[in-house]
Swiss-Prot record:
Organism in which the protein naturally occurs: Nostoc sp. (strain PCC 7120 / SAG 25.82 / UTEX 2576)
Pfam families per UniProt: Ribosomal_S15 (PF00312)
GO annotation terms (biological process): translation
Role according to the record: One of the primary rRNA binding proteins, it binds directly to 16S rRNA where it helps nucleate assembly of the platform of the 30S subunit by binding and bridging several RNA helices of the 16S rRNA.
Family the entry assigns: Belongs to the universal ribosomal protein uS15 family.
Keywords of this entry: Ribonucleoprotein, Ribosomal protein, RNA-binding, rRNA-binding
HAMAP family referenced in this protein's UniProt entry, alphabetically: Ribosomal_uS15_B
Record protein name field: Small ribosomal subunit protein uS15
Length: 89
């Protein structure tokens, strides 16, 4: 379920703002989205895994707060990011 180092690096390369960026809001949201997608697949196969479901809800809440921050800071970056990630309609 955990992301491999190679997959993390791919996400960072795709969403980084500048060459050494590893912790910007865009990268954090992209990482959380990948983890949420993997955990959702796991929960579809393992419906009774309630501890993982709780973890999923925590990740969704964290991503929601980061998205709210990004929307407040830069509406254009927010719209572009949710379009690239395919979240929120």
């Amino acid at each position: 379920m955990a992301l491999t180092q190679q997959r993390k690096q791919e996400i960072i390369n795709n969403y980084q703002v500048h060459g050494t960026d590893t912790g910007s809001t865009d990268v954090q949201i992209a990482m959380l989205t990948e983890r949420i997608n993997r955990l959702s697949e796991h929960l579809q196969a393992n419906k009774k895994d309630h501890s993982s479901r709780r973890g999923l809800l925590k990740l969704i809440g964290h991503r929601k707060r980061l998205l709210a921050y990004l929307q407040q800071e830069s509406r254009e970056k927010y719209q572009a990011l949710i379009g690239r990630l395919g979240i929120r309609g």
